[in-house]
Amino acid sequence: MTIITKHASARAALHAGHASSRPLSEGYENVGLAGEFEFGRFCGQMPDLSERPAGDKGVDFVVPLLYTVDVKTARKAHNLIHEASKPLAADIYVLAEYGEDDEAKLVGWVWRAALAKADIKDFGHGIDNRYIPREMLRPMEELGRRIWRHR
């Protein structure tokens, strides 16, 4: 069992039955944690693996710029999506794509202000989401330059 699988199983058990938990696919927590680990490799930080019964309040990382980051990971990462009814808590939103190899690849990112202005759509689960197509995201190299410049 990998560290991701171990912590994903613990998170799934911790959040089972919670109103805010939306496991829309098999291995939902594993997919999300894989994206967080990949972003952690990108920025030189470990994901926060502490048990948080109330969730992470929409913030996965605080990078050296003191900007907060929320990583959104999907198997089919056509769009960066964020549930429209939830507050946009992070400064930066990153899209990661989870592959058949159980690894995640970082796709791109946007500022909170851009996501706040994004169109809203229900992608078939009865939940309205703000979304930005992956082609419209900023390149990860740009975010990397911003992070590393301030270290």
Indicate residue ranges for each PLM-predicted region:
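Nucleic-acid endonuclease domains
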Residues: 1-65, 71-151
